[in-house]
Amino acid sequence: MNRCLVVIPTFNEADNVPQLLPIILNLGDHFNVLVVDDGSPDGTAKLVKEMQKTEPRIHLIERAGKMGLGTAYVAGFKFALANGFEFIFEMDADFSHDPQELPRLLDKAQTYDLVIGSRYISGVNVVNWPLRRLMLSYGANVYTRIITGMPVRDATGGFKCFRRKVLESIDLDAIHSNGYAFQIEMNFKSWRNGFKLHEIPIVFTDRRNGVSKMSKQIVYEAVWMVWRLKIK
């Protein structure tokens, strides 16, 4: 089995990381984890370093401050490409994404180039979100699909698997978006470059521990990103 890297951006995830990483690694020896930590004051990076002492498949990038989701994933993608990983995953640290679903993403990635764990491909599969946030997310995805023409029902989700060749085709240094906009941009560029995208249904459960990182700025950025992609 070709090596897999699960990239997990973190900011104050000390409650979740010690539980999450062992679950991922127990899925098989081909799974590695890269934590990209943005200077978490709660000691997230310190916990990861302790785990690294006994597990060589855990990797860590420490950054000086809160630099954003998009740049964290770009750093992770560059690490994956530089270290020979074939399948590169995005995943939240807070158990919103079920780590047991990673093998399903990997299985579909044998056939497709980008596999998206989709909240909306088979109805609406979201747990613990207030109605306003759910409508905002669902509406943003309908809006994205209409404006860009991209045939993806969950363009803003962050649980996915890229084949190496997809990331190699994208100028990662030109990616400057964050949050929803980052997910939309990566999906769009993968699709525009001719790669095969596929969605599988997942259940998204709002974070187990900690505080949500959602903000109005993330939403506004996504609204403008859709038009930027449309006119390029």
State the predicted function of each range.
Residues 151, 174-178, 187-203:
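Catalytic donor-sugar/metal-binding loop of nucleotide-sugar-dependent glycosyltransferases
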